[in-house]
Amino acid sequence: MAPGGRAGFRGGSSRGGPSRGGTRGRGSSRGRGRGRGRAVAQQPRGARFDDKRLASKDESESEAGSESPSDDESDAMEVDSNEEDEEETQSAQPYLSLMRSLVESAPKAKRRKLDHASAERQGPESTKPEAAPEATDGEEDGDEDGEERDVDFVEEPEEDPTNAAPEDLFDEDDDLDVSDPFEVHFADPKEEVLRPRLEAIQGNKWRMERIAANSTRVFFNTPDAGDAAAKPLPAPISGISDLKLKKRLQEAMAPKHAKFDQVEQTIAPLLFNYQDMLYCNRTVAGSQGIRRMASLHALNHVFKADGNEDLELRDQGFTRPKVLMLLPTRQSCVKMVDMIVSICEPDQQENRKRFEDGYIDKQSKFSDDKPDDFKDLFSGSDDDMFRLGMKFTRKTIKYFSQFYNSDIIFASPLGLRMAIGSEEEKKLDFDFLSSIELVIVDQADALLMQNWEHVEFIFEHLNVQPKDAHGCDFSRVRSWYLDDQAKHFRQTVIFSAFNTPELVELLRTHCHNWAGKARLQQESAGTIQHLPVKARQTFSRFEAGSIAADPDARFAYFTKAIVPMLARHRGRDAAGTLVFIPSYLDFVRVRNYFANNPAVENVSFGTISEYADVPEASRARSHFLNGRHKVLLYTERAHHFRRYQIKGVKRVVMYALPDNPLFYQEIAGGYLQKSEQSLLVEHGQGVVRVMFSKYDVMKLERIVGTSRVGKMIHDQGDTFDFV
């Protein structure tokens, strides 16, 4: 079994895609690519790691498809479930063969609908899309590994949009308001404003303005169309009365939440005026307000985008789905869905019990010592493999509607990637993304710890003109859809706890909104001021000629400046060094160096990475505490998914700074505090050594503070001490 204990049982195609080890783990140079307890990250290819001096078995960097750590009890349950499913699959083979033969002989017109349903379920690994009917008897289609039933599978034909039932249409209860942002941006944009802005976008001409508001910095980019007098920021919004909402939403929200809190007032002007936004100050305390604003905006857009079928207007897209929400876990999906339900107050909820059975986990599984952000992200169902279509009618919400019949699609990046298929397949299905007009990415910082390539893949396939008609009435399609300009009208909203180069690049390359885009970033006082103990913190800057040269320059500095210090320690002073390494690729490089280089042959070490299972991690922690291992190599993603409370730490070496500033506080402060309390370290004698380059400016700002970062990046000196 691969590290993590689940690689042999979580593969297959029953969730709508290939084996998890095959697509999720490629990651990036940042070592990303999986979710907690479920996800897989493929390790870099190369020779198998051979550590002759390390007693415990280590993971192989050439091993692919390994799962993230899980406890022994859940591993045992997976094994038992797998064996039972295999027996059921074998006994059902005659029946499956019969159903397969019946489907293969079915008329071609019927197969088209079944093909889509099967493709949505099976994804790229499916070789027999006709096999979807097998699932009607409760068996898993194409699942030879005995995997559990796909709770997100939908077997439903595409609806003909020209024959919509009366109950599927929304009430026309609002008078036309030409100042409504929906009308200004989508329905009836002014040609004299729109055309020069589109031309500026095509020429990559943007005008940037920096606006300071309290402790928040707003970087606003608008297409440089020569309209210098245009106001970059819309008018402030303090409550529901300032919004142009559908009447039913206005009446529902006014009694419950008439006034907005500070977070809501910050994001509402950009959000409801259809401008792209990267909000980099998401907190646990402000998460409820963010979900409220995002849900209200999504509902308002869906209700307004559903045109009157009796009018001969160009008011539609190619396909029905208008809103896409990318979320990290099933529990995060539950929170967003529940917020939507509380706002629109439907009379009926179709398939609600199925939703609760598949998405809600009420068991408490974390101890009190876990931090709030960890419990907020991983409480409930932390499965990062899901997709859910939601359809709205006048009085009903339908869960698990087929994508082409849905108004809003909720999905994790992996779940949606599986539904689309892989590039190796002859038939990819992403037409349902052709008319997405609003993308909401919540908890983007958590998605960075999964496989960010899936997010990039999804954005590359947004607003691409569809290959099939899907019953579209082209006489009703908006002209800018036909002109292949939908991406310039789509609004993208990203909420993250902090900013990273990946998020900035996503905003730069995939956000081309003609209304402009903004990045909201909080000024930071620095987490070094909030450490629970007094420790000497030394920040050492090394020079790197380019971003591509940074990994080699970092490794060279580590081996020349840090390793000799570790090798000099003797006796009891040699124990207790924790080396924190954010990137898994850097971790492999350092691990191999410690295992094979003569310079550190007298330095015993252990490792804890995101691939280490629970017994392996426990063994490494124990050996580190009792001094058998002098050095412990520890990755950022291992800390993200597990938040281990490591004891015996006397000194911390940051091979690179973490993206999440809370990790610095927990590792550099929390671990040393435990050592002081257990009398392993005298008060104030803990040591923290940090390596950084000029390309770590975003991370460094969150650690040392906005006021210090410029000096540390540009000063002639390369060593900075904090006490």
Curated annotation (Swiss-Prot):
Signal sequence range: none
Matches recorded under Gene3D superfamilies: P-loop containing nucleotide triphosphate hydrolases
Chain intervals for the UniProt region annotation (Disordered): 1-175
Gene Ontology molecular functions: rRNA binding; U3 snoRNA binding
Cellular localisation: Nucleus, Nucleolus
Keyword rRNA processing: yes
Coiled coil stretches, renumbered: none
Alphabetized UniProt keyword annotations: Nucleus, Ribonucleoprotein, Ribosome biogenesis, rRNA processing
Basic and acidic residues bias (residue ranges): 47-59
Lineage: superkingdom: Eukaryota
Ranges of biased composition (kind: Acidic residues): 60-89, 136-161
InterPro entries: P-loop_NTPase (IPR027417), UTP25 (IPR010678), UTP25_C (IPR053939), UTP25_NTPase-like (IPR053940)
GO biological process: maturation of SSU-rRNA from tricistronic rRNA transcript (SSU-rRNA, 5.8S rRNA, LSU-rRNA)
Residue spans of biased composition, Gly residues class: 1-26
Pfam families assigned: Utp25_C, UTP25_NTPase-like
GO CC terms in record: nucleolus; small-subunit processome
Biased composition (Basic residues): 27-37
PANTHER family (UniProt xref): ORF PROTEIN-RELATED (PTHR12933), U3 SMALL NUCLEOLAR RNA-ASSOCIATED PROTEIN 25 HOMOLOG (PTHR12933:SF0)
Assembly description: Component of the ribosomal small subunit (SSU) processome composed of at least 40 protein subunits and snoRNA U3.
Role noted for this protein: DEAD-box RNA helicase-like protein required for pre-18S rRNA processing, specifically at sites A0, A1, and A2.
Family: Belongs to the UTP25 family.
Protein name as annotated: U3 small nucleolar RNA-associated protein 25
